[in-house]
A protein has these predicted regions:
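Conserved, structured core segments of small domains
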Residues: 1-99
């Protein structure tokens, strides 16, 4: 299973339909995080772009899963790139305390 980063381009303006779907979208994302499919999910402060780090068999499988996001039809673009290295504090072992 590969590891991919997905770059999302969000719409310039969020209409009522988009905003109404946010809770359903967040629940969908949270479920994938709990299942270990999504490792990280981030949206830029200006709400124009997003990044999702996720597991998938192929880039096509990852794109297919992104197409199931409740907000998928509003995305202006989706880029899927397979990662060679993904390192973060969250993926490291906890520090040992020698009390």
């Amino acid at each position: 299973m590969g590891l991919y980063v997905v770059t999302l381009r969000l719409p310039d303006a969020f209409d009522e339909e988009f905003v109404a779907l946010i809770p359903r979208h967040r629940a969908f994302i949270n479920n994938l995080i709990e299942e270990g499919v999504i490792l990280s999910y981030a949206i830029s402060a200006d709400r124009s772009r997003g990044w999702v780090t996720m597991h998938g068999a192929t880039a096509e499988d990852v794109r297919g899963l992104v197409e199931q996001f409740p907000l998928a039809r509003f995305l202006q673009s989706v880029e899927v790139d397979e990662l060679f290295v993904f390192d973060s504090a969250a993926t490291r072992l906890p520090k040992i305390s020698l009390n």
